[in-house]
């Protein structure tokens, strides 16, 4: 760094050529931007270890150790990158939007279209799933729709999905809602006055005449703490944190609208899909997820229903974010919406908290060119 600054000073003092000075400044700036781009993209590339080449979720959900090992590797790299606080302003989180059936260039590979409510659940590697609903034609929001239990899923941690108590926004899937009778047990207020129902078993037994309302659960009773953990219980896989949006109804309860309760859009680096990226052209919001200036016209999914131009959109979105253009964080849910010919395209978001601050391009250039161009910082 000192040698580079000495070279710039030498050009200013002895060359007397403004063209040479500008050329050298441009070369130094290009080098700084390229180095910063490598720093920022490294954690996202390590997400490929977590999300690459698997149908619709994290590796290791079958009880293996690959997910935990990959998480440790990603955390290790993030901590290494976060140690050097070069500038005060920067990014504390790096978020990668998963476009429908897309490859985020070399960051997240082999995104699969996957809907467990369809039979068949989709063709891996394609932009949209094929299949038809089973029993319930109105999609996953149809009341009392029985979820399909995954095979060899790990058990729920004691205390629910969130340590220290139930999930925010409602009960965990598989648990009874407040005011409803528990599966296989009496009502919250105790048994009905007068004892058990005539001609039927006592409270706590099966309902007379067959299974209780809501339909049977494949494989037996509904999931309970210590039982199978369904994919709908991972809101950060399905849709990621959704800022300022209420919870959405899912089978057995309500998923929280946000995982940790806070998102700071200014400190999140977004990499999104679409022909211009979900954040719009160069991350400015123009022609973004919600169309031309938010009107819905020329929106990303309508321009690119099959994800063909998603890598181009990722490039423009990354380039815009690199220079400080950033739109508010916008997360697209997996299920529903107007994405794809069947409306069931796989989209979402993954966020990596680097545990520190990765310096921004503006801060790097301000430190590099100060005091010559200190106004950049």
UniProtKB/Swiss-Prot annotation:
- Cystine pairs: none
Tissue specificity is:
Specifically expressed in the ejaculatory bulb and seminal fluid. Detected in mated females 3 minutes after the start of mating, and for at least 3 hours after the start of mating.
According to its record, what are the GO cellular component terms? extracellular region; extracellular space
Q: Which UniProt keywords apply?
A: Behavior, Secreted, Signal
**Which residue ranges are recorded for the region named Disordered?**
155-253
Q: Which residues form the signal peptide?
A: 1-20
State where composition is biased (Pro residues).
165-228
User: Which subcellular locations apply to this protein?
Assistant: Secreted
Domain of life assignment: Eukaryota
Q: Does the keyword Secreted apply?
A: yes
Question: Any one Gene Ontology biological process term?
Answer: mating plug formation
Function noted in UniProt: Major protein component of the posterior mating plug. Accessory gland proteins constitute, or are required for formation of the anterior mating plug. Posterior mating plug forms before sperm transfer and the anterior mating plug is formed after the start of mating.
Q: What is this protein called?
A: Ejaculatory bulb-specific protein 1
């Amino acid at each position: 760094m000192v040698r580079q600054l000495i070279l710039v000073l030498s050009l200013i003092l002895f060359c007397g050529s403004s063209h040479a000075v500008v050329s050298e400044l441009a070369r130094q700036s290009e080098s700084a931007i390229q180095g910063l781009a490598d720093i920022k993209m490294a954690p996202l590339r390590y997400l490929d270890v977590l999300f690459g080449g698997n149908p619709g979720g994290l590796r290791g959900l079958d009880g293996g150790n690959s997910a935990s090992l990959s998480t440790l590797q990603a955390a290790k790299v993030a901590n290494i990158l976060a140690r050097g606080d070069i500038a005060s302003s920067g990014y504390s989180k790096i978020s990668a939007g998963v476009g429908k059936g897309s490859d985020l260039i070399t960051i997240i590979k082999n995104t699969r279209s996957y809907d467990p409510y369809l039979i068949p659940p989709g063709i891996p590697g394609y932009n949209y799933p094929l299949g038809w609903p089973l029993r319930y034609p109105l999609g996953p929001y149809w009341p009392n729709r029985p979820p399909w239990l995954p095979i060899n899923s790990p058990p729920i941690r004691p205390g629910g999905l969130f340590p220290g108590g139930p999930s925010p926004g409602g009960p965990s899937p598989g648990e009874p809602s407040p005011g409803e009778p528990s599966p296989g047990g009496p009502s919250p207020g105790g048994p009905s006055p007068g004892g058990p129902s005539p001609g039927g078993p006592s409270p706590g037994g099966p309902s007379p005449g067959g299974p209780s309302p809501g339909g049977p659960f494949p494989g037996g009773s509904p999931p309970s703490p210590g039982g199978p953990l369904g994919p709908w219980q991972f809101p950060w896989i399905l849709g990621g944190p959704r800022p300022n949006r209420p919870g959405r109804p899912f089978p057995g309860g309500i998923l929280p609208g946000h995982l940790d309760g806070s998102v700071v859009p200014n400190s999140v680096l977004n990499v999104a899909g679409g022909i211009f990226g979900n954040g719009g052209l160069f991350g400015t919001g123009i022609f973004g997820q919600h169309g031309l200036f938010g009107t819905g016209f020329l929106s990303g999914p309508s321009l690119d229903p099959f994800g063909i131009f998603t890598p181009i959109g990722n490039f423009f979105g990354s380039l815009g974010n690199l220079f400080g253009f950033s739109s508010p964080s916008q997360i697209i849910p997996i299920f529903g919406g107007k994405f794809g010919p069947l409306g069931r395209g796989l989209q979402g978001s993954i966020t990596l908290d680097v545990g520190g601050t990765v310096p921004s391009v503006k801060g790097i250039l301000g430190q590099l060119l100060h005091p010559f161009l200190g106004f950049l910082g």
